[in-house]
């Protein structure tokens, strides 16, 4: 009976029918021009806002950074498809179409920070509590999310973080090489590259003010070594930052919201429990 209740709850949580899906509101992230210009003039930063019913709103919001190795974005299963789940919990979801770095990390970083600031600027209208704005990221988007969580301050700093199979380090021994090269570029001196690798190895940037974290990954991930997530969790633990890590025995990389992931419902249930824990 208990198992049946759990299964029923999970099905209700993850139902994403067109009837209940909230229509997103697309916004230009930089209507007055971006702080950092991209070499790709066609690459425009945008965000899509999915708001829960006002009667259901908890005041929470999650700013979502899809993955794609800093070359493209998996906007659906690592972005828009999460809207119904979060809205059903009374949480706003903001999916960010951030620009690619082409060797300049501040391009995606500034886009993600701008998204968080925009959410806080619209907090009253959108029924959001400015102190309950989190960031979520997948793969390279997990690197971007953890960069914001460990580097950003003031109105750009998130209150919690959710990371799926994240790239965390830029250490060549266990980073994701594509993300490393696309983010940092490849034409630096050895000394400058070492500095950049250290600055953007987010496990090295954790301190006691880093926001609480939920981390989920598969043990058999061949694209981004699971050691990335382990290393980040270890540093959060050492600095007394509340964190929850969930390691699934299989699934590889890039499952996002796909129900074909064998542990999809378990992952959803565990994340819901974590969100309810604070």
Regions inferred by a protein language model and the residue ranges of each:
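Primarily recognizes the serine-hydrolase "nucleophile elbow" in alpha/beta-hydrolase
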Residues: 114-179, 197
């Amino acid at each position: 009976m208990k198992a049946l209740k759990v299964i029923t709850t999970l099905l209700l949580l993850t139902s994403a029918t067109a009837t209940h899906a909230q229509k997103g509101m697309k916004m230009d992230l930089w209507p007055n021009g971006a702080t950092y210009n991209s070499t790709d003039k066609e690459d425009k930063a945008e965000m899509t806002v999915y708001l829960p019913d006002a009667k259901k709103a908890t005041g929470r919001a999650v700013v979502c950074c899809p993955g794609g190795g800093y070359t493209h974005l998996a906007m659906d299963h690592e972005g828009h498809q999460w809207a119904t789940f979060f809205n059903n919990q009374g949480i706003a979801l903001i999916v960010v179409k951030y620009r690619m770095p082409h060797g300049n990390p501040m391009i995606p970083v500034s886009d993600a920070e701008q998204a968080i600031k925009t959410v806080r600027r619209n907090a009253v209208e959108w029924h959001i509590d400015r102190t309950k704005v989190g960031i979520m990221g997948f793969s390279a988007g997990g690197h971007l999310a953890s960069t914001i969580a460990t580097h950003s301050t003031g109105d750009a700093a998130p209150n919690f973080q959710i990371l799926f199979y994240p790239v965390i380090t830029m250490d060549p021994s266990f980073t994701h090489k594509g993300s490393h090269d696309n983010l940092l570029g490849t034409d630096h001196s050895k000394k400058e590259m070492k500095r950049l690798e250290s600055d953007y190895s987010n496990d090295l940037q954790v301190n006691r003010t880093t926001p609480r974290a939920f981390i989920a990954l598969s043990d058999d991930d061949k694209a981004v070594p699971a050691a990335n997530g382990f290393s980040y969790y270890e540093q959060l633990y050492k600095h007394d930052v509340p964190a929850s890590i969930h390691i699934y025995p299989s699934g590889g990389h890039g499952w996002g919201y796909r129900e074909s992931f064998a542990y999809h419902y378990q992952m959803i249930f565990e994340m819901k429990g974590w969100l309810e824990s604070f």
